């Protein structure tokens, strides 16, 4: 939440300020610089068919796709609790690949990176998993340890700033070494 969608618990599936901000920055920059999708919008894009059609929303960058995504995100928010939305999101996203094996979902990533079930990981390990999300294959600790450490620590910074963890937990997690191999 602290890294992917700071307003997750207060929005209704979309956050218009984020959408407009990213639209503006992307137009000015002439390319995609920043995303404005909420966790719920990302879930809509990844999982759901539009109006029970076979055709998925997909990942094409079009205004019509974004409108479909917004509508579905609102419907998802009306149908599910925030906890269920977060669970579905974490179980459906891509965490990269190790030895040509794709890691879809947080449980698979936890098993492949740490050799643990998701319930067994600690704060530093969980923060590393979340740190993978913006660019999984460019942040795996076995291939890109500096980037993985930097991004993991940014996740911890965000969590501390938002009050999700205390100073002791923050300091302990930042001291933990990254895994050297899967």
PLM regions with names:
Residues 166-182:
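Non-catalytic structural connector segments
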């Amino acid at each position: 939440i602290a890294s992917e969608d700071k307003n997750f618990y207060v929005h209704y599936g979309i956050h218009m300020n984020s959408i407009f901000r990213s639209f503006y920055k992307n137009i000015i920059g002439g390319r995609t610089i920043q995303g404005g999708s909420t966790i719920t919008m990302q879930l809509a894009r990844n999982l759901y068919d539009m109006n029970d059609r076979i055709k998925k929303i997909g990942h094409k960058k079009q205004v019509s796709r974004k409108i479909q995504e917004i509508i579905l995100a609102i419907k998802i928010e009306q149908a599910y609790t925030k906890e269920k939305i977060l669970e579905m999101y974490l179980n459906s996203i891509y965490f990269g690949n190790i030895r040509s094996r794709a890691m879809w979902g947080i449980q698979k990533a936890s098993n492949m990176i740490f050799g643990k079930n998701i319930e067994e990981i600690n704060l530093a390990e969980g923060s590393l998993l979340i740190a993978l999300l913006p660019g999984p294959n460019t942040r795996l600790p076995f291939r890109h340890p500096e980037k993985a450490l930097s991004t993991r620590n940014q996740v911890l910074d965000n969590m501390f700033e938002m009050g999700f963890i205390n100073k002791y937990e923050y300091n302990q997690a930042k001291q933990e070494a990254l895994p050297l191999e899967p």
